Amino acid sequence: MRKPITLILVVALALVLLATSEVSAYRACGFPGRRCSPTEECCEGLVCQPRKNGPSMCYRPDP
């Protein structure tokens, strides 16, 4: 009787892990407000802005 419940839980866990890995792959570039470094690029259309009193951040430049 317990096998179907266990199977459902395992499948649900696998789907959650797959979904989170997809999101992290999508977020591989720096989105607005994310810290950036010379090795980590910001997303398309964003630039890495060094700040005096903190880490560099990605931001959308004014047109």
Swiss-Prot record:
<protein>
    <recommendedName>
        <fullName>Cysteine-rich venom protein 3</fullName>
    </recommendedName>
</protein>
<feature type="signal peptide">
    <location>
        <begin position="1"/>
        <end position="25"/>
    </location>
</feature>
<feature type="disulfide bond">
    <location>
        <begin position="36"/>
        <end position="48"/>
    </location>
</feature>
<dbReference type="Pfam" id="PF07740">
    <property type="entry name" value="Toxin_12"/>
</dbReference>
<keyword id="KW-0732">Signal</keyword>
<dbReference type="InterPro" id="IPR011696">
    <property type="entry name" value="Huwentoxin-1"/>
</dbReference>
<dbReference type="GO" id="GO:0005576">
    <property type="term" value="C:extracellular region"/>
</dbReference>
<feature type="disulfide bond">
    <location>
        <begin position="42"/>
        <end position="58"/>
    </location>
</feature>
<dbReference type="GO" id="GO:0008200">
    <property type="term" value="F:ion channel inhibitor activity"/>
</dbReference>
<keyword id="KW-1015">Disulfide bond</keyword>
<feature type="disulfide bond">
    <location>
        <begin position="29"/>
        <end position="43"/>
    </location>
</feature>
<keyword id="KW-0960">Knottin</keyword>
<keyword id="KW-0964">Secreted</keyword>
